[in-house]
Amino acid sequence: MCTMKKVTLPDEPVLEQRKDRTIEKIKDMTLKRTIARSILENLHDWFGIDESREQYIRECSDWMFFAVRENGHYAGFLCLKETGRQTVELAVMGVLRAYHRKGLGKALFHEAKKAAAKEGYSFMQVKTVKMGVYEDYDITNRFYLSLGFAEFEVIEELWGKENPCQIYVMSLK
C-alpha cells in the first residue's frame, strides 16, 4: 500500500503526491488548455468530434481543473463547472488510454469531489452517452457507477437520438 502525503507548492497546489503520481489543482489558464489538448487529442474514441473537443479545450480554462502526473508526465485531467449554487458538473474528464484501469481517474475524481465539497457544493452531476449504445461509453458508464453516481435521467434528444444523454448524480454530503 502506498502512503500519500499532502503538500502545497506556491504555483499550483499539489493535492496528492505519491512517489510516481501527483494530483494538482491547476489555475493557470494556458496550462489548463495545454493539458486538455494533449490528453483529449489522444482519446479519439471519446473526443473524436473536432468541434466538441475544441469547445472543451476552450471552456476548461474557466472551470476548476485537476490534473494527474504519472512519472512526471500529465496523464489525465478532470474539470468541474458550476451548474447551480449547490451543484457542479463533472464537465470533462480524460485519462490517456495507457493509464486506464490504474487508478488515476478514480484518484482524480476523489480529489475533485473533496474540493467541490470544501467549496460548499452539495451535489455533482455528470452526463455521458447512455449505457448500451457504444462499448467505449459503456466503460465510461460503469466507471461513473463505480464512483457512486446514481442514474438520474436520460434525455434522448439532447445530443440526438443516436446519442441519448444519461445524467448521473451524487450527493457530496
Segments the model singles out, each with a brief description of its role:
Residues 144, 149:
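Conserved active-site tyrosine of GNAT-family acetyltransferases
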Residues 2-51:
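Short amphipathic alpha-helix that is part of the acyltransferase structural core
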Residues 135-140, 154-164:
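Short glycine/proline-centered loop/turn elements that form peptide/ligand docking sites
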Residues 101-114, 118, 142:
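Conserved acetyl-CoA-binding loop-helix of GNAT-fold acetyltransferases
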Residues 93-101, 129-132:
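A short, internal acetyl-CoA/4′-phosphopantetheine-binding micro-motif in the GNAT/acyltransferase core
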Residues 116-135:
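Conserved GNAT acetyl-CoA-binding A-motif
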Residues 67, 73-81, 87-94:
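Conserved beta-strand in the GNAT
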Residues 82-91, 100, 119-122, 164:
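A conserved beta-turn-beta hairpin within the catalytic core of GNAT-like acetyltransferases
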